[in-house]
């Protein structure tokens, strides 16, 4: 009886060990299967960084090449920017009259999800290419993009974002001047802005990212560098109505006849709090920063003002455009829009309000935007006239800027972005 009990005990112990071994093996297999594609991509990218470095030598000027070589993540992002769009198997053909959509994002995932959800309901979105431009690399933002299945989508990542440079420029360096008057004491690097304040990488990244994105989309990507038509620009806290894409197509088609002097077409009024007039008339007004679109000829006009853009002491790209670039065109810069908005700015937390810092803005991203039946169909008619708004309030020539953009290093990096796709590596910063 004792022997029988002993055999049973040994058999149970063996089964228990076998069960533990099976569980451990299964856990390892599941862990390997669940490794994010981005991690695998990173591994494959690292395998060929030397080849990428040689490739960059032929494409970047010496200044940008020096910055990129100092950061392994920067090199990896350069490589990722050449990846083909996703979902080409689901949407193999793009419409010839497409308006490419570019989505400028940072790290506000709670907003980004809302914007992506609204895009998924936009009629005609499957006919075009969506480009998501990231300010550096944030895994949660990357996962949201990888979940998109409603159109072709391409990701680009700013490889010069201060967020990926922890101890060197464009991030924070140990030798940076930090407080007012530090530069007078010597032994620190950096120029103050017009108010005596030194650069904040988190702040300057807003303008750097926008300018890098514009130059990359118009001049650097295979998918868009030959695109002559309009490109629509939106941000991670913009809610698009279902009729947004069809409306912007209509506006860009009508613009040459209805408003030949208009530089752009907008989905929303320049006053972000307005939902529009609701009148039966098109509107020509100052260009807004919600759902704005323009074509390559306008981009060329903007690009010619790179020095004005890069040397204006304001960290906001839009205020820089209103106060110095647009006035330099020599005529009022009007945009054409409908009488009812097709896009809404819903964010409460600004891009300059980060996480983990004093004064952070907390918002769970829950929005309640009413979408009416008229917001689901094209609500712009070709027979309408155009109401022109002149002498609107807002930033104009003569405004000297809010500062935050006084460091010569930022200004010259900005100028380098303007030449990175137009000159060889022998070109130096202007």
UniProtKB/Swiss-Prot annotation:
Pathway: Protein modification; protein glycosylation
Membrane-related topology note: Single-pass type II membrane protein
Sequence positions that bind Mn(2+): 237, 345
Glycan attachment sites: 41, 61, 295
Main location as per UniProt: Golgi
Essential cofactor(s): Mn(2+)
Record's catalysed reaction(s): an N(4)-{beta-D-GlcNAc-(1->2)-alpha-D-Man-(1->3)-[alpha-D-Man-(1->6)]-beta-D-Man-(1->4)-beta-D-GlcNAc-(1->4)-beta-D-GlcNAc}-L-asparaginyl-[protein] + UDP-N-acetyl-alpha-D-glucosamine = N(4)-{beta-D-GlcNAc-(1->2)-alpha-D-Man-(1->3)-[beta-D-GlcNAc-(1->2)-alpha-D-Man-(1->6)]-beta-D-Man-(1->4)-beta-D-GlcNAc-(1->4)-beta-D-GlcNAc}-L-asparaginyl-[protein] + UDP + H(+)
Topological region Cytoplasmic: 1-12
EC number annotated for this UniProt entry: 2.4.1.143
Coiled coil ranges: none
Localization annotation: Golgi apparatus membrane
Keyword Plastid: no
One Pfam family matching this protein: MGAT2
Keywords: Disulfide bond, Glycoprotein, Glycosyltransferase, Golgi apparatus, Manganese, Membrane, Metal-binding, Signal-anchor, Transferase, Transmembrane, Transmembrane helix
Stretches assigned to the Lumenal side: 36-430
UniProt KW Transcription regulation keyword: no
Chain sites annotated for binding substrate: 104-108, 135, 205-209
Family: Belongs to the glycosyltransferase 16 (GT16) protein family.
Function of the molecule: Catalyzes an essential step in the conversion of oligo-mannose and hybrid to complex N-glycans.
Name of the protein: Alpha-1,6-mannosyl-glycoprotein 2-beta-N-acetylglucosaminyltransferase
Organism per entry: Arabidopsis thaliana (Mouse-ear cress)
Lineage: Eukaryota, Viridiplantae, Streptophyta, Embryophyta, Tracheophyta
Name of the coding gene: GNT2
